[in-house]
């Protein structure tokens, strides 16, 4: 029995000779280039990373807003908005898709504890949960040219006035049904895409090709960790 969960992009990462590291039971690329080169690329151009290891829970129910208010103290549930919540000293992110459906994103390996907590506090809320961590792949695009790269394939406008920070939408992306959310990393615009894992390699290669004009650089776990840490520290200042 394989003790690790695998990203749908693992074979692609290995073909490029990337060092693979274990993160919360997932095998993920440690880095594609030097840490300094990846940081410089995302600060000056655009970087792309594999987010497939993130926990992903689909929540549905007519009483979902009331349930989330009671259990996670999310008092303002608005479709199209993202809400950051602390759980066990870690940040989880709620993406309100519709009035009765949401996608809950957790750090790798935390989807189980979060789902257990929600189930234990379900009561008579008539809300259902589905762990879709293994069924959905995820990609991060961050940097000054991330918006231009995304706009090449997105059916909706990602202009800042139309799609500001902490917003989410379901749309067609390169002819693939996807959930796109914007969560900037400090001053860097950043977008996350979630979609059926069967399209992971297609979208990765499509974005790599389209991003050449913007000097797109694949990012490893080390760089993503530093970016997230820096964004968290700035938000706490």
Predicted features along the sequence, with ranges:
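Basic, glycine/lysine-rich polyanion-binding surfaces/domains
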Residues: 1-237
């Amino acid at each position: 029995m394989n003790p690790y969960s695998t990203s749908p992009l693992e074979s692609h990462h290995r073909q490029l000779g990337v060092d693979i590291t274990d993160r919360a039971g997932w095998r993920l690329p440690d880095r594609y280039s030097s840490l300094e080169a990846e940081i410089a690329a995302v600060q000056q151009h655009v970087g792309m990373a594999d987010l497939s290891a993130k926990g992903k829970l689909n929540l549905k129910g007519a009483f979902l807003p009331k349930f989330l208010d009671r259990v996670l103290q999310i008092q303002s549930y608005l479709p199209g908005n993202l809400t950051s919540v602390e759980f066990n000293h870690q940040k989880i992110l709620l993406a309100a898709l519709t009035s009765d459906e949401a996608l809950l994103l957790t750090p790798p390996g935390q989807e189980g504890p979060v789902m257990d907590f929600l189930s234990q506090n379900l009561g008579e809320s008539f809300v259902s949960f589905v762990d879709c961590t293994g069924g959905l792949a995820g990609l991060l695009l961050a940097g000054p040219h991330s918006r231009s790269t995304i706009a090449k394939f997105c059916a909706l406008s990602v202009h800042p006035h139309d799609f500001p920070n902490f917003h989410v939408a379901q749309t067609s992306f390169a002819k693939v049904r996807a959930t796109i959310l914007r969560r900037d990393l400090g001053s860097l615009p950043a977008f996350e895409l979630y979609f059926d894992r069967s399209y992971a390699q297609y979208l990765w290669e499509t974005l790599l090709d389209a991003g050449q004009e913007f000097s797109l650089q694949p990012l490893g776990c080390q760089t993503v960790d530093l970016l997230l840490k820096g964004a968290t520290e700035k938000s706490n200042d």
